[in-house]
């Protein structure tokens, strides 16, 4: 059921954010590493992590800083992130930036507690 809902949202969206820069996430076949059968859709669900906010550490990538959602038009939506993402949950970033996806997105109304569904990172040192 969740897979069908996730895929239908992806199919209906022509751009995954106002600028189209996260389209590679939704256009790919990326699936959540934390939620069964949930696509990393991208439509207002994925935010770019600000430069310098993510660091490779022993147990995962430590994030302390803002994530920016490119929703509709400026001013963009900023969300403070303070977490450690285990290496087992990290997927390769196609554009060399750190990206964090969550469901429900900041613009969705839901009883569900927002949680990280996908995290994309460039290779260390790139």
Regions of interest found by a model, annotated:
Residues 1-10:
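Bacterial N-terminal signal peptides
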Residues 63-99:
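Short Fe-S-cluster ligation motifs
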């Amino acid at each position: 059921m969740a897979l069908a809902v996730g895929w239908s949202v992806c199919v209906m969206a022509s751009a995954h954010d106002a600028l189209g820069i996260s389209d590679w996430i939704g256009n790919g076949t990326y699936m959540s590493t934390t939620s069964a059968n949930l696509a990393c859709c991208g439509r207002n669900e994925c935010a770019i992590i600000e430069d310098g906010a993510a660091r490779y550490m022993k147990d995962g990538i430590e994030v302390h800083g803002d994530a920016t959602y490119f929703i509709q038009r400026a001013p963009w939506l900023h969300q403070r992130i303070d977490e450690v993402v285990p290496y087992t949950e990290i997927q390769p970033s196609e554009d060399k930036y750190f990206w964090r996806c969550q469901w429900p997105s900041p613009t969705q109304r839901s009883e569900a507690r927002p949680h990280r569904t996908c995290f994309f990172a460039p290779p260390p040192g790139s």
